[in-house]
Amino acid sequence: MSNRSFAIGDIHGCARTLRQLLKVLGLAKTDTLYLLGDYIDRGPDSRGVIETILRMQEEGFDIRPICGNHEEMLLLAIRSGVFELIEWLEQGGGATLKSYGVSQPQEIPRPHLDFMENLPLFRETDRFVFVHAGLDFTIEDPFSEAGRAAMLWERSGKVVPARIGGRKMVSGHCTQTLDEIRAGLKSSHLRIDNGCVYPGLPGKGNLVALHLETGALIVQENIG
């Protein structure tokens, strides 16, 4: 089997769903998996998601995660003050604390916090740029620290292919229906977050993997 590459969007604590999707993919150690951030919050098992990623990395799988805005919010809740903590809790942080059996984010196991603290904001290949949300094309270097907020929070969907070497951008963050995801595969911006944690929304509620070589979508319904 030739080497394959996949990208998976926002997981949001849906550990069982992630593990089932990985099983369906039949991921081999010669494959590469890009994870687009937002591993935690809202769903039932944020701890299980992080444990799955760390275990696979330890076992030698080529897992390449990036940072999402929810990891950023958790870290800000630890580093900053009460306002940041309340904001994170309002965005699903309570579910993360519950999954760890703790009452404060700083009580999350150190290896898991280290994982989140060391996540890059983007990754790239000769064909794709992977980022959680988007890029700010109004600044000289969209990948610089000045573009941090856009990489984590951007929702416009704007892409200027010439500014990224004619490559396609792959992101999560903004939930799309399956039809919208499929239609977007023809564009320069591949948005693959199907809102896994929202199974009640029409056209959403699945965890989606994009096969980067073929453009095929592998869709796993939310099972928790």
Where are the regions that the model predicts?
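N-terminal active-site segment of His-dependent metallophosphoesterases
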Residues: 1-52
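Active-site-proximal beta-strand elements of phosphoester/diester hydrolases
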Residues: 5-12, 128-134, 190-192
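Divalent metal-coordination and catalytic microenvironments
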Residues: 10, 38, 53, 68-69, ...
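Active-site environment of divalent metal-dependent phosphoester hydrolases
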Residues: 12-16, 41-44, 72-75, 137-138, ...
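Active-site neighborhood of divalent metal-dependent phosphoester bond hydrolases
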Residues: 42-124, 151-160
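His/acidic metal-ligating clusters that form di-metal
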Residues: 108-179
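Conserved beta-sheet core of the metallophosphoesterase superfamily
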Residues: 147-220
